[in-house]
Structures are given as C-alpha cells and as structure tokens.
Regions:
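A general structural motif
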Residues: 73-79, 109-117, 156-160
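Glycine-/charge-enriched secondary-structure boundary and capping motifs
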Residues: 28, 32-42, 46, 51, ...
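A glycine- and small/hydrophobic-rich beta-loop-beta segment
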Residues: 89, 94-100, 105-132
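C-terminal substrate/ligand-recognition segments
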Residues: 1-4, 8
Length: 189
C-alpha cells in the first residue's frame, strides 16, 4: 500500500487462516499460534486494527491436512491522484532503496518502519517519488526488472552495488524512482 502511494496509518488488515485440525497434541497448536502471534505483533506494532477475517482451523479430512496458511491483505482508501504505479517513468531518474530496520530475529522494528513509511508517503504526495515497488524475498534485482518492463526502460546499476545488495531479502523495503533533479532535496531530508 505504501509503495502505491497509500498512507500506512489508514491501513486495515484482514486475515484468513487455514490450519490442520487441533487435537490434544501440543505440536499441532504451534503453527496457528506462531502465525497469529505474528499477525498480532504487526497490528500492535503499527497500531492498526484488523477489520475481519475468517478462520478455517479444521482443515483436516480423515488423515489429510491442509497446508498451514495465513492469508492476509490490507486495504486503504485514497484519492486516485495520489496513487502511483510501479513501472519506471522517465529515463535518467534515480532509484533509491528505503530499508526498514529489523532486530536480530528479522522482526521489523515497527517504530522505525512507521517513521520510514510516513516519510515515503510524504515524498509520494509531494511528487518526489514517482514510482515505487515493495521488495520481496527476491530482492532488488527482481524488483528492478519488473519496474523496467512496464515502459521498456533499462537500468544502469552503480559499480558499488554488490551482488548481496541485489539479491538479499528485501521484505518490508521500498524501491523508489525519484527524478534526478529532486535527489538533492531528498538527501537534505
């Protein structure tokens, strides 16, 4: 949502869980507990509610269990003029990676994430960010390729960027396109 120009403070979550039938075996409770604890942690960390969901915790037929799954999506309402798309817009623009902080267990440090996402929203609203992509576990390389395909633009990657920089897990990070003439103002902030 943030990469599309939305305001993270207005996000509402929904969840649907699919887990094998619970029993007296305590190990069968660990997956739903861990998944829901993670969802709860994100809601509390951002200070945002879930507006609904459905649980399907009896996902077992005879001796066949469903794959353990927690599906989550989030919604936001915005004006159409505030929405941006991920494809690169203009040759000569720069790409900037906004990285979130995570703790030793790879859990987002929500105070930092909230501040960063607020700044990204502000930069999108004022036109500094013209396109953006929410990174996934595939990292920057996959994101750059997908952003470039849209308008058939290429990307030159600086020599200082390492292979690790290109392929490390980027969950939570945002890759943003910024016009070259707005980079100086961005660096001041």
């Amino acid at each position: 949502i943030v990469a599309a120009g939305g305001d993270y403070k207005k996000i509402r979550f929904t969840f649907q869980e699919y887990f094998r039938r619970m029993s007296s075996d305590p190990t069968r409770w660990s997956q739903p507990f861990a998944a829901l604890l993670g969802a709860y942690s994100a809601q509390m960390g951002f200070g945002l509610p879930s507006i609904g969901g459905k649980d399907s915790m009896s996902g077992t037929f005879n001796d066949i269990d469903v794959p353990p799954t927690l599906v989550s999506f989030a919604v936001d309402v915005a004006k159409y003029g505030d929405i941006i798309t991920p494809e690169l817009k203009t040759p000569g623009n720069k790409l900037v990676r906004f990285s979130i902080n995570k703790d030793d267990f790879d859990i987002p440090m929500y105070e930092n994430v909230a501040e960063l996402y607020g700044k990204i929203h502000e930069l999108t609203e004022n036109g500094t960010i013209v396109s953006a992509y929410a990174l996934d576990s595939k990292g920057v390389a996959a994101a750059v390729a997908k952003m470039a395909f849209g308008n058939k633009l290429g990307v030159k990657i600086d020599d200082e960027v390492t292979t690790d920089d290109l392929f490390d897990n980027g969950l939570g990070d945002i890759l943003a396109e910024i016009p070259a003439d707005k980079m100086a103002a961005l660096e001041e902030k």
